[in-house]
Amino acid sequence: MLPAEGFAAQDFSAAEQAIFLADQLANLRPPATLRYSFRKAGSLEGGFDDSVLLSFSPLADGSCCASKGEFLSGPRRLALPDIENAKSNPVILYFLEHDIREMHRLTQGPENYFRKRIRMTVYQGATVAPASFRYQGKTVAGREVSFKPYLDDPNRYRYEKLAGKEYRFLLSDAVPGGVLGIRTRIAAATADAPPLLTEELLIEGATP
């Protein structure tokens, strides 16, 4: 999911830089653990509450960070590779990998197709806007990146019910690891009906 390395910053959109390339772990002092809540809800199928844990350890020179992740639990747990030299927060890639596998499960469409749609939209169709969030009782400044990767997909007829899916990334340097949360939402066919599907990951805090 991460754009290819070796390109200058100007080759990437503002959304790509905010989501994939920013040094989101700059405010983290390893060893540290980031804790996130995860909630799935909606009328499409049963929901659940779970958690996500990311553990960070210092590199040999003391800098940040090598990381290990636990994304959800039990039969929902996502097998994740360790990351040897993380700069951006791995929780973003983990969430997107979970999301892509869910899109495949719900539609039987190829995972690589959904990856490509997300990459293309973050590059050329995402919105980045200033935002403020609440974190541990305080208001913090940040940015919200939002996009709908399937809205103008010529193949959307194959999964029309899910084609309006919206992604929102809540980013703030005032939050450990730089990512306050990620939300996805698929609205129902009528405005007065509850959403078809929502998923929300929110940071709970950091511990040494």
At which residue positions do the language-model features occur?
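Surface-exposed, glycine/proline- and aromatic-rich loop segments on solvent-exposed faces
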Residues: 77-102
